[in-house]
Regions:
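Short, glycine/charged-enriched secondary-structure capping and boundary segments
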Residues: 10-13, 54-57, 77-81, 108-111, ...
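Core dinuclear metal-dependent hydrolase active-site scaffold
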Residues: 1-54, 129-186
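Cap/insert and terminal regions of metallo-dependent hydrolase folds
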Residues: 181-200
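A structural micro-motif
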Residues: 58, 90-92, 125-127, 143, ...
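Acidic/polar short surface loop at catalytic or gating sites that assists cofactor/ion binding
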Residues: 4-11, 83-128
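Active-site metal-binding motif and surrounding structural segment of the metallo-beta-lactamase
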Residues: 38, 43-95, 195-198
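Structural signal for conserved beta-strand scaffold positions within catalytic alpha/beta enzyme cores
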Residues: 65, 96, 131, 147-149, ...
Length: 200
């Protein structure tokens, strides 16, 4: 896929035309990966269509954001969640790298984000935003989650994508490694001792 999806709305190259004609697996939406009942990785701009295709997102409690490019974190989708808050008793938790979290700090009082009401939505318990440090392990939902430093930028200066090592209760360990180039030495050193069962 690509940041604009496949087929790109404004492209008539052979690949995009093939995807339009054949559909199915050749049509690619923007990033969003559901892990079990209540964890999701990224929340791109196709979340509405993905929910239509794959079912309700009501059980989502935790969203791990890889980076703040809008094909991975489309903050306007937060508005969809806020429209159903009467059905929720707990906030949806969003997790960012330290650099990516700065994007939330900018949005909190920005008129571009729901007329400057994001901070108020936090106070009402609709959302909770968290910073994660690379290479530290956190208990999130039913997984042990370790963000590792990817090699891909984001909207903020010096932001690098967070790829995620996730360990399930049964010991299965996976790497969600989207939007990265070749890993830097620090990440490679960390990964040497990871015995992965699944690499995405």
């Amino acid at each position: 896929g690509a940041a604009e999806g496949v087929p790109s709305p404004f492209c008539d190259c052979p690949m995009c035309n093939y995807a339009r004609e054949h559909g199915g697996k050749d049509v690619r939406k923007r990033s969003c990966f559901r892990l079990g009942r209540n964890i999701m990785i990224d929340m791109g701009p196709d979340i509405f269509t993905q929910a239509l295709q794959y079912g309700s997102m009501c059980d989502i409690e935790h969203v791990l954001i890889t980076h703040t490019h809008d094909d991975h974190f489309n903050f306007t989708a937060l508005g969809l969640m806020s429209m159903a808050t009467h059905l929720r008793t707990t906030p949806v938790h969003f997790y960012f790298s330290e650099e990516g979290y700065r994007f939330i700090e900018l949005l909190r009082d920005s008129e571009i984000a729901f007329g400057g009401t994001l901070r108020g939505m936090e106070k009402k318990g609709i959302y909770a935003f968290h910073k994660l440090k690379y290479f530290e392990t956190y208990s999130i939902g039913e997984y042990e989650v370790t963000p590792i430093r990817g090699n891909h930028g984001g909207n903020m200066a010096k932001e690098r994508s967070a790829n995620y090592v996730l360990k399930a209760k049964d010991g299965t360990k996976m790497l969600y490694g989207m939007d990265t180039g070749l890993y830097e030495e620090e990440t490679l050193d960390f990964m040497k001792n990871q015995n992965l069962d699944i690499w995405m």
